[in-house]
Amino acid sequence: MEIGIYTFGETRVDPLTGRQQGAEERVAHLLEEIEVADRVGLDVFGIGEHHRPDFAVSAPAVVLAAAAARTKNIRLTSAVTVLSSSDPVRVFQDFATLDLISGGRAEIMAGRGSFTESFPLFGQDLDAYDEIFSEKLELLLQLRESYRSWQEYIC
């Protein structure tokens, strides 16, 4: 059995002061949380992707790359990468790079997303929700299974 933690990186309100936590502060605390999770021996830490002002993380791969530099063993995953409003090639490349930085500890958890605010931001048609996700997931899986060497294209 594996044990891990995931977060959406939501910013919090201090119950004593009523002060809203800023994104910079939340991400700093998030990186500290990942370090502690690694030290105590948890197996995986996941960060969700959101494109709303009440969440601090819109690019999980970037935050996970910072965490990779500060940890040794814990696997690092998105929870989830909103594939419906993302370019699957870019997602694959970002996480392949994270996998290199982390020494093979990166994972992608792809999903549709539970909030639909990101669709108009990225020019997606909400009426094609299911078709968009299916097509992009198929491409992401093809990228994972296909070895590409660009060496033959170097002049």
Regions flagged by a language model, labelled:
Residues 19-20, 27, 81, 123-126:
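Active-site oxyanion-binding pockets that recognize sulfate/phosphate
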Residues 8-10, 50-52, 81-83, 111-115:
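Active-site beta-loop-alpha junctions enriched in small/polar residues
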Residues 16, 87-155:
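Internal, glycine-rich beta/alpha segment that forms the wall or movable "lid"
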Residues 24-29, 66-70, 85, 98-100, ...:
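Short, surface-exposed linear patches
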Residues 4, 77, 107-109:
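Structural detector of well-ordered beta-strand residues that form the stable sheet scaffold
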Residues 1-75:
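N-terminal beta1-alpha1-beta2 module of alpha/beta enzyme domains
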Residues 53-56, 81-87, 125-126:
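Glycine-rich "substrate-gating" loop/helix at the edge of Rossmann-like oxidoreductase active sites
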Residues 73-80, 91-95:
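Outer membrane beta-barrel
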